[in-house]
Amino acid sequence: MDINLIKQYINSSLPNDKESLIQYYGQLKQILNALSDKEQQQLLNNNGKISEQQQLSIENNYKVIGSIEEKMKSIEHLFNNLDVSDSNNNNSTSPVFISLDNQNTVNNNNNNNNNNNNNNNNNNNNNNNSLAPTVILDNNDNKKTAEIILPDHHNNTPQQQPEQQVQQQQVQQQQQVQQQQQQPEQQQQHLTEEQIQKQQQSQASIQQAIANMGEKKRSSSRHSGPPEIPPEEIKFDVKTDLLGGGAYGKVYKATCRGKKVAVKVPKKQTLSESELKSFKNEVEIMKQIFHPNVVLCLGACTKPGKVMIVSELMQTDLEKLIHSSEVEPPPLYERMKMCLDAALGINWLHGICNIIHRDLKLANLMISKDKTVKIGDFGFSQVIKTGTTLSDQKGPKGTALYMAPEVMMKHEFNEKADVYSFGLILYEMATCEELFPEYSEIDPFYDAICNKKLRPPIPDSFPKSLKTLIQKCWDHDPNKRPSFNEVTQRMNEVLTDTAISGLDAAMFWKYNFIKPESESVPWNEFVYKLSSVVNLPTQVLSPLAQLFVSQSYEEEIGGVVTMERFDLMNKWFGNFFNSKYGPAILYEMIELLKKRWFHFDISRDISEKRLRGRPENTFLLRLSANDPIKTPFTISKTKGSKPTHKRVSREDVQINEIKQFPMGYKFTVPLDGNELVFGSITQMVEELHRIGNLSIPCPITEIKVPYLTD
């Protein structure tokens, strides 16, 4: 298990709804059990003798275990408080949430008061610790509810408690809560201010999550995982609601309890014992996963003839998006962001859940309405212990085009089989071409992949980081393929190289800002780095936020600079981050911002609307998106009562021309059959205004003028 990934999960903010918080708690419990088993096994394997490096690893793991336990107990404690309050208000006669932490509190008090019985009490503590709270779900009254409960300490079968015993238990429960509330006050006397502040922040975040849950009816049913959904509650039309299908069955758009969902209906509805086991295995795997890049399982129906899996509804999948004959695929950068989404989801499956997907392909990478990519279809997925391998005795499972050679050859395999599939996905997403179109038969394809080690040709135009990652992922030797943790890190470099076209600009960004999820950087951090490179004060550069800060981030404090915006700025203005030419370019940019005639990067259509009805030669200057490197600026003006547009070209200058053109560029504009050359944009506009070619700067407002064609 990836300890760094686990730490990120523990430190992540809590979900805002009750169902997600319950799943989060269950995931913490699974991680805790896995880490504990790992440490015990390591000690057994070494007969209690461990190296210094192993000792450090174990100590690190124990710290993580402690963090998990602390977070779980905080959640249990707050659930307990919530339900004691509910029971007081509703005269409830059965406690719903029983915190394990409460039981430990009582035992610890007994230990302090009865020194002669230390051994017995310690044994009781150990027994209590082994009985972790259980997550249960229920569907009574058409409402899905969730609870955290403790296993019965005395009986193996549930039974009704006498009313007197229930009341006594409620009194004990309230006393335990009071003891818990008093304990932190005593403990805080021994904590530093920083520790107290962190504790208060943690409690506040959990309280906020609890507050967002709303009031839901609770039940004492003992079901686990996604709820069993009655088939009559899943409503869809087999003729009009079909989303897709394959050998396994079909997927429909449906409605369940008022929510739009996707429902997977296996082709075979009368399942044998082994088939039912396989179906339940898929549901069991899906219910363990809670991650923004994995499709969420909402429930299942296992009634014979009505077998279905219900999950969140997605908009489309990558196969339809990339290979559609009707719509152009998104830009390369957007496609690589989608690949990063997929990598993050698979990294979670491998690192936290120990799940191998086994059928990664574009059709199984779903896209939500907000363009987030999520992993779907766990029909062939398997849980695998860290460091072990699997093999297909009855033949390989998955899709042949994406299948790793070791799987195809029925050799032992592990999670690196998914890495191979991702390499082909990455290639397909980058080229938008179908894989291996020259093969239609399995035998020649098998020979090409397994024996000849054939892979698709990678275009020379690909960034080096992308080429290297693809080649590493589809390496014939599984041991040479990277882990998905490494894949996600390398994808950040790929994103930089695909978002920023200029080599110097990409190097500047990588050196100063590249880090996990570094698609943007706060403006304050960006301007500080830029200031140190060009040796200009940040106060001088601060007006440039109007150009650099992305429009969609205006509400954030200070704003952010995205890689895409940084790339555009580099194309429009050149290497403004260069220590030699940068200061001159940046001063020119600051001067432009002072001019009334500079209208930023508005479109041609908007510029014409602003010029309509204006006097002759009213003008504006705008940044051009058509060819921002060769013709970065456009002069739009009125001529004969109609808008006209004239592009301004830019080209590099020779070394002996630097004194005349200090920005390292010269700008050319056509006029009356001639080409006028200038050292800056402001100089060009001033000269054109002097000779009468341009007159009044255009305001940013529009005049509503009716046209005959309107």
From Swiss-Prot:
Amino acid composition bias (Low complexity), ranges on this chain: 83-94, 107-129, 197-208
Entry binding sites for ATP: 243-251, 264
SUPFAM superfamilies in UniProt: beta-sandwich domain of Sec23/24 (SSF81995), Protein kinase-like (PK-like) (SSF56112), SH2 domain (SSF55550)
Record localization: Membrane
Chain intervals for the UniProt region annotation (Disordered): 83-136, 189-232
GO biological process: signal transduction
Chief location bin: membrane
Domain SH2: 597-707
UniProt catalytic activity: L-seryl-[protein] + ATP = O-phospho-L-seryl-[protein] + ADP + H(+); L-threonyl-[protein] + ATP = O-phospho-L-threonyl-[protein] + ADP + H(+)
Enzyme class: transferase
Top-level lineage group: Eukaryota
Gene3D superfamilies registered for this protein in UniProt: Phosphorylase Kinase, domain 1, SH2 domain, Transferase(Phosphotransferase) domain 1
CDD domains noted in UniProt: SH2_ShkD_ShkE, STKc_MAP3K-like
UniProt-annotated catalytic positions: 359
Functional summary from the UniProt entry: Required for proper chemotaxis and phagocytosis; proper spatiotemporal control of F-actin levels in chemotaxing cells. Negative regulator of the PI3K (phosphatidylinositol 3 kinase) pathway. Predominantly phosphorylates serines and threonines and tyrosines at a lower level.
Descriptive protein name: Dual specificity protein kinase shkE
Organism: Dictyostelium discoideum
